[in-house]
Amino acid sequence: MYYILYILFFISLSATTLQEIYENSGPANGYDKYMELNSNIIYRGGIGIFEGDIYIDCNGAVIDLEDGNGIWIYADEQYPSSLEIKDCSIVNGLYYGVSFGGTSNGKITNCNFLDTNFGVKMFDFTDVTITNSIFGNNQTYGIGIYTEYPILDISYSLFWDNESGDCWESCPGWGNIWTQFELEDNLEIIYNNPLFIDYNNFDFNLNENSPCINSGNPLLFDADGSRSDIGANSFNNSLCNIAGDLNQDNYINVLDVVDMTNCILFNECESNCFDLNEDDEYNVLDILVIVDFILN
C-alpha cells in the first residue's frame, strides 16, 4: 500500500501535464487507470480516453487546458469505457472541460468547470451523473447535450455567469439551434456567485460566506465531518485556515487589519476567526495580534 502511494506521489511531482499522468498511471482499486493528482501542482492539457475504466482524483488540483482540448471519452460495444472524476478544477478549455461520446458513462463529483466553451458535453447514448459541481464563466453553456438520447442526472450543483446559458440541448433536425432546458427545483441547484478566494489566480477555495458551504449532497461529508460542500475545494468549518488571515487570501497584511477594524467598529465579525487572542471579545487587542503577525 505504501509503495503504491509513493509511486502515485512521485508521478504527481515529476509530471506537469495530465497526459503524462495518464500514461504513467496503472490499475488500482478496480480501475484500469487510477490517477491521483497533487493539489500543489497545476496540470496542463487534456487527455483522450477510448477504452477502460478511468478514475481521476484531483485532490483540489487545477487542470489548465490552456485554450486546448479538454478530457474526452468515447466508448462502444467493443471498447467500453467510463470516467469517474472528483475534486478537480478544469479551466480554460477552447471546446469543453469534459466530453462524453458513444456509450460512455461517467460520474462527476465536486468539480469546477470554469472559463471553458462548454463545461460538459454529452453526445450519443452517454449516461452521466453530476453532483456537488460548479459551472461558471463558460463562454457558451455550462452543460450542452447533443440529441435527445444522453441521460443526465445532476443535483446539488451551482451555475454562475455562463454566457449563453446554463443547460441547453440540440436535437436532431434542429441544425445548430439550441433550446434551454430547466432543471427541476428539487435538484437543489444554486444560481449564484460561488465566492472563490481568488478566482483570477486559480485559488478556488471557498470564502466563508460562499453559498456552496454545506450545500452539497447531504449523503456525502467533508473531511471536517460536516455536510459536503459544492465545488472542488471544501471549506473547513472547524478551523481558521491561517490565524490572522481574516479575508482568507493566504496573506496576513493591512487588509486583515482593516477587516478587524470593521469588525470592532461596525460589528462586522463574520466568524470566530476574528477573536485572535481567544478572550471572547473583539477589540484592539486582536488588532495588536495581527500587527504582531505582520511585523514578526
Feature map (PLM): residue ranges:
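Sec-dependent N-terminal signal peptides
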Residues: 3-13
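Predominantly extracellular beta-rich ligand-binding scaffolds that present long acidic/polar faces
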Residues: 87-89, 97-101, 105-203
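Beta-solenoid repeat scaffold
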Residues: 8, 32-34, 45-64, 82-84, ...
